[in-house]
Amino acid sequence: MDRKPVLGFVGIGVMGESMVRNLIKAGYRTLISTRTKSKAEALIQEGAEWQDEVKDVAANADVIITMVGYPKDVEEVYIGEKGILKHAKPHSILIDMTTSSPALAEEIYQHALSKQLYALDAPVSGGDVGAKEGRLSIMVGGELEVYEKAQPIFEVMGQNIVLQGPAGAGQHTKMCNQIAIASNMIGVSEAIVYAEKAGLNPTTVLESVESGAAGSWSLSNLAPRMISNRFEPGFYVKHFIKDMTIALESAKQMGMLTPGLELSKKLYEDLAERGEEDSGTQALVKLFRDA
């Protein structure tokens, strides 16, 4: 693309807002749509152009990015009567950055091809901080030629950007990410509560362990929030449960053993039943403190 393409962005949540902000700062004309316009007001003030419906974004953008909540939302946004596949211009690039079903990503890819559209599945990891700082890890599935055209856009939003394979490969890679995090969050929560119950200062304990063999993104970024009782969402409990459900379904189809994932999903479901579904995933520590 010689000129900067016009971007469309559907879904302005915790991470989507920061991603759009970075795209605007990078000089991209960006059209946006989300269910609640009030959530987009700050971005509109910063230069984003509001569109009343998804079909308007699709009809007027060269590259359409989606970052919605659940696979059913992805299906509606792409395949519905007012969706992207029915209204996008031929040769547009469609990038779904929602964590969603690998099978749905493959379905969207096939639908897109039949309409001379080019689809990538590109879920992300890095949370609210990674989105704000443009340091997301982006896991991409799709064709190399399309990926290369979209790469300058990805580079505004992330730093670790890898084409993992054909359609669906990005979503499968994100499932690997979520499976690893699922058990890790149990360990991080247990470690913090152990330190507290042993009468230690958990902050200084963290200084000792985070740079050693126990180190992880969750330990460095979420354990401090656990210690200071900051449970606002960088990533929602309800969305993590959704991700683990998708991962378990995919793993079952492959005949895998997933005891850690199953336990983590159950614990997070218990947490959600206590009214924490809109909290950040670090709220898991509450289960261990209250035991």
Please provide the spans of the model-predicted regions.
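NAD(P)+-binding Rossmann beta1-loop-alpha1 motif at the extreme N-terminus of oxidoreductases
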Residues: 1-66, 97-98, 128
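Interdomain hinge/lid region at the active-site interface
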Residues: 171, 215-279, 291
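Rossmann-fold dinucleotide-binding core
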Residues: 100-178
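Active-site-proximal catalytic alpha-helix in oxidoreductases
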Residues: 66, 134, 138-141, 162, ...
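Hydrophobic residues within alpha-helices
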Residues: 19-20, 39, 108, 153, ...
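Residues in the short beta-alpha loop(s) of Rossmann-like NAD(P)-binding domains
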Residues: 35-36, 70, 143
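Rossmann-fold NAD(P) dinucleotide-binding segment
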Residues: 54-117
